[in-house]
């Protein structure tokens, strides 16, 4: 993704606020697919000359929360409740120019939910979007 971002004149920042001792149980290839899809959407719909993508990883109780924020065109409030629905595309004219089948975020949602997590988004048009997902931390079961 790094070369792709460089070619698109995008900056990427990564902030990890989680201790190295914290573990999750997850399929690394599937989580990579989730992150690649979300960042790919940020790149695809970026409308700024100097786009930014920030990735933050936080420890939130029993979960690890990942936030992927961009400063792109954003998603209309009327579309936000549906972006994880299979085949949903926000604007037909925009999507025909950028391609895509409208199933990427539905697959992302399934992967996260299959890992016992949750995914959601906030967005402001012309300001950007933040995609959030949480994955449960690994916790040892005490011996009795």
Language model region names:
Residues 8, 13-22:
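Conserved catalytic submotifs in the C-terminal HATPase_c
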Residues 42-43:
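Short helix-loop "hinge" at the ATP-lid/N-box region of the Bergerat-fold HATPase_c
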Residues 52-62:
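Short beta-strand/loop element within the Bergerat-fold HATPase_c
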Residues 70:
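Acidic ATP/Mg2+-coordinating residue in the GHKL
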Residues 75-89:
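Short conserved segment of the HATPase_c
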Residues 104, 108:
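Short alpha-helical Gxxx[C/S/T] motif in the catalytic ATP-binding
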Residues 116-117:
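Conserved glycine-rich
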